[in-house]
Amino acid sequence: MAKQKVRIRLKAYDHKILDQSARQIVEAAERTGALVAGPVPLPTKIERYSVIRSGFIDKDSQEQFEIRTHKRLIDVLDPSQQTINALMKLNLPAGVDIEIKL
């Protein structure tokens, strides 16, 4: 018989908030007796943009900006209904994108 698992994928621009959210999820799942694998750090996506500083001339003068998207993966193995309810009631900070797959 195949075991059921819940895969939780977290994304955020700030790694401190992301790690705090991952810790809250792991603690909530472990309190209800579920096995937890993770948080596993996934590769950080870096988007870089170059913008010309002046509006008309001076192509050599550019500014570089980057956005870093940090990701974590948490697997909750063999969750009970109590585990799922505890995860749904969690109040996570703004700025953390959560994707849950059953």
UniProtKB/Swiss-Prot annotation:
Belongs to the universal ribosomal protein uS10 family. The gene is rpsJ. GO terms for biological process: translation. This is Small ribosomal subunit protein uS10. It holds the Pfam family Ribosomal_S10. SMART domains: Ribosomal_S10 (SM01403). One of its GO terms (cellular component) is ribonucleoprotein complex. Involved in the binding of tRNA to the ribosomes. The keyword Ribosomal protein applies.
